[in-house]
Amino acid sequence: MFTLKKAEGKARRGEFTCAHGTVQTPVFMNVGTQGAIKGALSAEDLKNIGCQVELSNTYHLHLRPTDKVVRQMGGLHKFMTWDGPILTDSGGFQVFSLSSLRKIKEEGVYFASHIDGRKIFMGPEESMQIQSNLGSDICMAFDECIENPSPRDYVQKSVDRTYRWLVRCKAENARLNALPDTVNPQQMLWGINQGGTYADIRVDHMKRIADLDLPGYAIGGLAVGETAEEMYDIIEAVEPHMPKEKTRYLMGVGTPTNIIEAVARGVDFFDCVMPARNARHARLFSWEGAINLKNAKYQLDEGPIDPKCDCPVCRRYSRAYIRHLFIAEEMLAMRLCVMHNLYFYNKLMERIRNALDEGGFEAFRREYSEKLAKRI
């Protein structure tokens, strides 16, 4: 259930309530693909750095340790000892991005595992069943993820099939939630808008899926080849047709600047591997811009990663020390940097929410949208 508390322009300040708590929005979901954050962060760490929602991956957990094992362990919350909300993606993106050997049919997709090459089938019903076994609070519809740009005729064909798959997802989600032994009978299904960079196809698809009256809607298929401006144009085209009383989720996006600009265009939920992935390569975010900690100029730098940051890392360690850890290939380097970057993203969302509460979001946007994209 989503409650809109305040708005400034199209930017929205709200609350989303599910079986495992209430989420303050706009929010960034911390990505734990296989039930853990890459970089050795635990569920306890996530609490300490302000994470509200954890995101895990259906495809990867289906392969290892298998969703049936997770179900036997009591569901993903119990398995990873995380008591907050969890969103699971449908596995569609990974099926289409990781497997070069795949065959798309009306019933679903036949593909080869990227781990051992074994043949696997996944369709709308299978995706819903896997996510039901995981017991997430939010499950995402199974969809086809296409590259940008793609031929218009193929995009239209793909979107029509994705719509039919969503109808099947909705029916299967309702069936599974009604079972007496289901892990999370309050699991919510969110639909995904597709259509590549064709605004008219996007708008038509959004209108059709809005009629299905789902608890939330995502804009998918972006940040996969188009420019930032093309992405913003798509959001602006689709947003007027997204139900105002439902959550809006921009999948796989993005940089701090992308997030600020998408909030300004009416988006509530975000996820991206960027903060953790960049951290693992010593590329860090700060309130003055992006830092590459491997640069020689930090070798004798006694200051924290970001003097304006109060994360556990910045309160204790110097740039020089963390740089040394990277050069020495110590695992602690990744842990500290992932912790800092995720804290930064969670703090960014907190500051956006505070700005919306105080009616100062546009001023915040003017101050930080361009600044956070700089390299220093």
How would you name each of these model-derived features?
Residues 127, 158, 162-165, 169, ...:
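Alpha-helical packing segments of well-folded alpha/beta enzyme cores
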Residues 135, 166, 170-173, 177, ...:
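Structural signal for hydrophobic packing residues in well-ordered secondary-structure cores
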Residues 160-163, 172, 176, 188-305:
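Glycine-rich phosphate/ribose-binding loops and adjacent secondary-structure elements
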